[in-house]
Amino acid sequence: MKKLFLFFTLIFTAFAANSGLFDKKQTFLKVDDAFAFSATLSTDKSQLQAHWDIADGYYLYQDKISAELVGKSNPLSLHTQQAAELHQDPYFGEVKVFTHSIDGIFRGAFNNADDKVEITYQGCTEGFCYPPETKVLRIGDLVVSQKQIVEKTVEKNTALLSEQDRLADGLFHSKWAIFGFFVLGLGLAFTPCVLPMLPLLSAIVIGQQQRPNMMRAFSLAFLYVQGMALTYTLLGLAVAAIGLPFQIALQHPYVMIGLSILFVALALSMFGLFTIQLPNSLQNKLNTWSQKQTSGAFGGAFAMGMIAGLVASPCTSAPLSGALLYVAQSGDLFTGAVTLYLLALGMGVPLMLITLFGNKILPKSGEWMNTVKQTFGFVMLALPVFLLSRILPEVWEPRLWAGLATVFFIWFALQMSKNGFGYAIKIISFALAMVTVQPLQNWIWQTQTTTQSAVENMPVSQVKFKQIKNTEELDRTLAENPHSIAMLDLYADWCVACKEFEKLTFSDPQVQQQFQNILLLQVSMTKNSPENKALMERFNVMGLPTILFFDQQNNEIKGSRVTGFMDADAFSNWIEKLL
C-alpha cells in the first residue's frame, strides 16, 4: 500500500512540475513585424527606394526579393547597399540572406501614377518559414523622397588597381598630367602595337632608288609621324566628343579586310609588279608643282603615317585604353586632341631617331636597295596575315604564316651567292623553308599532327560561360548570383588577345579551380550591335579584351578591371585578391 501511494505521488508531482512545458507555445512575429517594409520614390522617378527593417533572429533571402511592374513581363533589378551573408538554411542549404536593415534600389521608369509595382520577398527564422509576401504599390501613392540613394561603390583597393584605372584616375589630379602622355608614348613605341610601323617608315625612307640625305630622311620621318599623330588626334577628338570606342569599329572585319588588301597592293608594288601612281592626266598637272618640292614622296609619307596609326590603334593596350578613358571622362575636346597628339608624338620620336641614325650607317646605293625594297614587301605582307588572323578561323593562322615564311626563305636563298658565306646562308634558308612548310603539308595531305588535332579537334577550354545579350539580362543574372563575385568577359572573334585568354589563361587548372567560386558571364562583341554599344557606354569600355568583376551588390569592384592579355599566373593572383 505504501509503495502504491508513493508511485502515484511521484506521477502527480512530475505532471505538476512539467505542466508549464505543455502549456507553453512558441510565438512568432507577424510577417509585417518581422520584416517591416516601406518604399519611396526618387525625385526623378527613376528609382523605387525600398527599405526593410528585419527583426532580431529573422532573415530575408536575397534571391527571393523581386519586383515587377504589373502587366509587364520584365522584372526590375535590385541593387542593395548592404552585403548579404552566407547562411546554412535547413530548407534551402547554403544561401545568401539579410539579417539587418536593407536599403535597396529598383531601377525603372516610374512616371505613370496609375502604374503598380509588385514587390515579393520571403524570410525565415529558426524553426519557422514565412510564405512569400507580396506588396502591391501604386506609383501615385508613393511618397517622393528628397534623398536619392546612391549605389554603393566599393572602396578602391590600390593593390587591385589596373593600369588603365591608375592612369585615368591619376591624371585628374594634375592639369599638366597630359604631358606625361609624351613619355608614355616613348615607351609604347617599343611595344608590339607599334613595331609594324617601323618597317613602313624604313620602307618609305630607304626604299627609294636614290639614297636620301639627312634632311630628306628627317623630313620624311617627321611627316610620317605627323600623319600618325593626326590619326590619334582625330581619335581623341572623336572619343571626347561622343565617347564611343572607335577601336571596336576599327577592328570590324570589313575594315580588317580593306586594310589587308591595301597592304597586299603596297607589297606587290614593292616587288615591282606594278607602280602605284596617279592617273597620267592628273600626274602631268602636278609635275610642275612637285618639281618645286624637295621630293614628291612627302605626301605619301604623311598618308602612310595615318595608315600606320590606324593599324596600331586596334591593338588595345592598357596605356592606350587609359588614355582614351581619361579623354572620355574629361569630355574636353582640347584635352582629347592634345593628349592623343602627345601620345603619338612620343611614339614617333624613337622612329625618327632610328631612321636618322640608321640612314647614316647605310652603304651607298646599289642593287642592294632593290633587295631591301623587296624585303620590306614581305614585311608588308606580314601585316595582312596579322590582321586576317583576327577574323579567320584559328586553324588558318599557322597556315598563312607558314606560307609567307616559306616563300620568304626560298626567295632569300635565291638572293644569296653560291660562294663562301652566301652559300652557307643559302643552305640554311632552304632548310628553314623545309621546316616552315610543314603546316602546309599537314593541311594539303590532311595528316593529323598533334598541333593540328589539338587545335581542330580538342576544346581549348572547359570553362562554361553564361552568355549575356544586353544590360537588362546582365542585371537579372547578377541579381541571382549565388557566388561572392561575378566575372563578365567581353569577347570578340576578331580579338587576338581574347583568344589568348581562352587558350592560355582560362584553360589553366588553377584558374579553373578559382572559377568554381565565381559566376562566369560572357558577352560576344563580335557584331558590335546596339546592345554591345550600350554595354560599352555603361561601363566605359574602350577596347578588348576587357574583363569586369562585380560584387554581391551587383556593382563593379573598383580597380578590378582587366584590360589587355594577362597570363595564367598573373590572372590567378588577380582573382585571389578578389575572392
From Swiss-Prot:
Keywords from the named record: Cell inner membrane, Cell membrane, Cytochrome c-type biogenesis, Disulfide bond, Electron transport, Membrane, NAD, Oxidoreductase, Redox-active center, Signal, Transmembrane, Transmembrane helix, Transport
GO molecular function: electron transfer activity; protein-disulfide reductase [NAD(P)H] activity; protein-disulfide reductase activity
Membrane topology (Periplasmic): 17-177, 251-253, 317-336, 389-396, 441-579
UniProt cross-references to Pfam families, sorted A to Z: DsbD_N, DsbD_TM, Thioredoxin_2
Disulfide bonding pattern of the chain: C124-C129, C193-C315, C495-C498
Protein localization: Cell inner membrane
Annotated InterPro entries: Cyt_c_assmbl_TM_dom (IPR003834), DsbD_gamma (IPR035671), DsbDN (IPR028250), DsbDN_sf (IPR036929), Thiol_diS_interchange_DbsD (IPR022910), Thioredoxin-like_fold (IPR012336), Thioredoxin-like_sf (IPR036249), Thioredoxin_CS (IPR017937)
Reactions accelerated catalytically: [protein]-dithiol + NAD(+) = [protein]-disulfide + NADH + H(+); [protein]-dithiol + NADP(+) = [protein]-disulfide + NADPH + H(+)
EC number: 1.8.1.8
This protein's name: Thiol:disulfide interchange protein DsbD
Species in which this protein is naturally found: Haemophilus influenzae (strain ATCC 51907 / DSM 11121 / KW20 / Rd)
Gene field: dsbD
